[in-house]
Amino acid sequence: MIQEELESIKEGMSKREGAEVIAQLGGGRFIAMTGAKDFFIGPKGIVFKIGRNSKTVNYVRINLNSMDTYDVEFLSVRKFKEKVKSTVKGVYADSLRGAFEQNTGLRTSL
């Protein structure tokens, strides 16, 4: 049981990969513009909370898949209930900002 958990954690995203995802989104400017906080790197990729927006998305999960592209989930978490608002699969690194802006309504830079 513990061995299976360790293997699933190893399959997840590393801190370095998580930092690279944030850098591809815009780094410090992205964090300031979107109110991103509470970053967590786990077996399903990087998850972080974002500020208020018109599409009621308050969490974003980004995972690197086997084709070296990203799968992005936009979530609404309320009272311990997780609802996936939208999912974008196969996003290239240079398209992460556009996918984020389109699905949250938040700008990532000035």
Locate each region found by the language model.
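Short, surface-exposed beta-strand/strand-loop-strand elements in extracellular ectodomains
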Residues: D68-K79
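Mixed-charge, Lys/Arg-enriched low-complexity segments
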Residues: I2-G12, R78-L110
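Short beta-strand micro-motifs enriched in acidic
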Residues: N63-M67
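Short, surface-exposed coil-to-beta transition loops
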Residues: K55-V60
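Negatively charged, low-complexity tracts enriched in Asp/Glu with abundant Ser/Thr
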Residues: I2-S54
